[in-house]
From Swiss-Prot:
It is an enzyme of class 6 (ligase). InterPro entries: Formate_THF_ligase, Formate_THF_ligase_CS, P-loop_NTPase. The gene is fhs. Keywords: ATP-binding, Ligase, Nucleotide-binding, One-carbon metabolism. The lineage of its organism: Bacteria, Bacillati, Bacillota, Bacilli, Lactobacillales. It comes from Lactobacillus gasseri (strain ATCC 33323 / DSM 20243 / BCRC 14619 / CIP 102991 / JCM 1131 / KCTC 3163 / NCIMB 11718 / NCTC 13722 / AM63). Its EC number is 6.3.4.3. One of its GO terms (molecular function) is formate-tetrahydrofolate ligase activity. PROSITE patterns: FTHFS_1 (PS00721). Belongs to the formate--tetrahydrofolate ligase family. This is Formate--tetrahydrofolate ligase.
């Protein structure tokens, strides 16, 4: 039985020079910018050259059921499946993934580079500083906030109201103490005193913009369109009104270029951008996915959290910005997560419990049927854990197949690409089937109708209840003429409802809309439901307690 940790496996794997990985996808030396021997950015010369290639590969979206707090191995499946298609089926394959946020690495969830023998490497670099994209974003976020505060202090000819500034500062750390602060305290020499707050870097609008921008000009335009706040005369003020878009774009110009790394089995992987799926759109950058589509025959990408969050947002929003729609959808399921959805105690998830599995199956059933309603072929992959019994695995596969869906059991974590060759064959076969894409809502639908259609069709809510604050914000959005934008619903990842403890597949509940936020630069409206936080906190035993580094700089304890 394998007892090696993820980081031990990664550190004991021989990497290929990143130049050789680039050659696998026909990138010339002048089309990459090296970050040491194992990481690179694809240059603008490379990106512009790739765009001329008319070829478009098959796009495979990997999503999942509602997760347990520890996650269900979606990234592991994405990486392992990509390795299997490339190295076992010998097809030209690329993986496109989000880059991890550093905050959760030291918190509860840990890193986001896969696990076991299905990882992207160098895992410690990717999980920590990588190529500096997150630091560039944090600098851009806080520079913009500082410029706005300085504008109010120095001139403020537009009479921007310091109490109606919508921008948040950013830091890529889980720190609950920064959710609400007061700045400019003391004398006026320290600035204008007003309340402010921090969001984790990946929750900031600039992260969404980085992931949606198609080039530097588009990046600059989107930054200029960010709504800063309102004047004392109730007029909206945008970044372009203050003239800061050029400086902020300059800070992000290098971060906009996608990063190239490899898997343990040397499959090329583009890792770029990382918005959360519960509070943003939850997909890697458009530049990364489009670049991958032009470079390979098969591209695997994932959508954050469950199919009700990242999956829905990918289908209804992200795919509108890509060069093509998904050709197939993979829904990742685990035995333990379905037992959790049956309200089984986390202390007993490793014990065989067929009745709990059957009860929890309702959650998977809804997710896979929701994805099928988009008109794209769907397959379920069961991520096998050591604690799963054969009876549980076979029962789950039977339940899925009885509902009319393809299903395979995979063990990429323990076996690498050999842990799911038949699954890879079936996924490739599915991409060749005809699809008839049907979004949940139409672009011309009103904001209320878009929210209602997602709530009814995806969540199975009975009704929607708007807070007084949300009603006021909706009226402001309509007054500005921005109510034609897509909606991104911010919701707990653990439930179809806005309450994380209501598990399974609930019906006929009320979805509570707490507030709405116009993300004008990104081009969507965030609809906050329940108690959603954009600045996480740390748990009682943070992962940081288990992380260390020796005198040779070798890091241990990352997972």
């Amino acid at each position: 039985m394998n007892l090696k940790s993820d980081i031990e496996i990664a550190q004991n794997t021989k990497e290929l020079p990143i130049k050789e990985i680039a050659q696998k996808i026909d990138l010339r030396p002048e089309e990459i910018e090296l970050y040491g021997n194992d990481k690179a950015k694809i240059s603008w010369k490379g990106i512009n050259c790739i765009k001329k290639n008319q070829k478009l590969g098959k796009l495979i979206l990997v999503t999942s059921i509602s997760p347990t707090p520890a996650g269900e191995g979606k990234s592991t499946i994405t990486i392992g499946l990509g390795d299997a298609i490339r190295n076992q089926l010998h097809k030209n394959t690329l993986i496109a993934l989000r880059e991890p946020s550093m905050g959760p690495v030291f918190g509860l969830k840990g890193g986001a580079t896969g696990g076991g023998y299905a990882q992207i490497i160098p895992m410690e670099d990717i999980n920590l500083h990588f190529t500096g994209d997150m630091h560039a974003l944090t600098s851009a976020i806080d520079t913009l906030a500082a410029l706005v505060d300085n504008y109010i202090y120095q001139d403020n000819s537009l009479e921007l109201d310091p109490n109606r500034i919508l921008l948040k500062r950013g830091i890529d750390v889980n720190d609950r103490t920064l959710r609400k602060i007061t700045i400019g305290q003391g004398s006026r020499f320290n600035g204008i005193e007003h309340e402010a707050s921090f969001a984790i870097t990946v929750a900031n609008e600039l992260m969404a913009i980085l992931c949606l921008a198609t080039d530097i000009n588009d990046l600059k335009k989107r930054i200029g369109n960010i709504l800063v706040g309102f004047s004392v005369k109730d007029e909206p003020v945008y970044v372009k009104d203050l003239g800061f878009e050029g400086a902020i774009a300059a800070l992000l110009s290098t971060a906009l270029k996608p990063n190239l790394v490899q898997t343990l089995e040397h499959t090329p992987a583009i890792v770029h951008g990382g918005p959360f799926a519960n509070i943003a759109h939850g997909a890697n950058s458009v530049i990364a996915t489009n670049t991958a589509l032009h470079l390979s025959d098969y591209v695997l990408t994932e959508a954050g959290f469950g199919a009700d969050l990242g999956g829905q947002k990918f289908m209804d929003f992200v795919s509108n910005h890509l060069d093509k729609r998904p050709d197939a959808v993979v829904v990742v399921a685990t035995v333990r997560a379905l037992k959790y959805q049956a309200e089984e105690s986390t202390d007993h998830l490793d014990e065989e419990n067929i009745p709990a599995l059957e009860k929890g199956f309702a959650n998977l059933k809804r997710h896979m049927e929701n994805m099928a309603h988009y008109g794209v072929p769907v397959i379920v992959l069961i991520n096998k854990f050591a604690s799963d019994t054969d009876q549980e695995l076979n029962k789950l596969k039977e339940l899925v197949q009885d509902d009319g869906f393809e299903c395979e059991i995979v063990s990429y974590h323990d076996e690498g690409s050999k842990g799911g060759i038949q699954a890879a064959e079936k996924v490739v076969e599915l991409t060749g089937k005809a699809s008839d894409f049907k979004p949940v809502y139409k672009p011309e639908d009103s904001v209320e109708d878009k929210i209602a259609k997602i709530a009814h069709k995806i969540y199975h809510a009975k009704d929607i209840e708007y807070s007084d604050t949300a009603k006021k914000q909706l009226a402001e959005i309509k007054k500005m003429g921005k109510d034609e934008l897509p909606v991104i619903i911010a919701k707990t990842q653990y439930s179809f409802t806005d309450k994380k403890k209501i598990l399974g597949a609930p019906e006929d509940f009320i979805l509570h809309v707490k507030d709405l936020a116009l993300k004008n630069g990104a081009g969507f409206i965030v609809v906050a439901t329940g108690s959603i936080l954009d600045m996480p906190g740390l748990p009682k035993h943070p992962a940081a307690l288990d992380i260390d580094v020796d005198n040779n700089g070798k890091i241990s304890g990352l997972f």
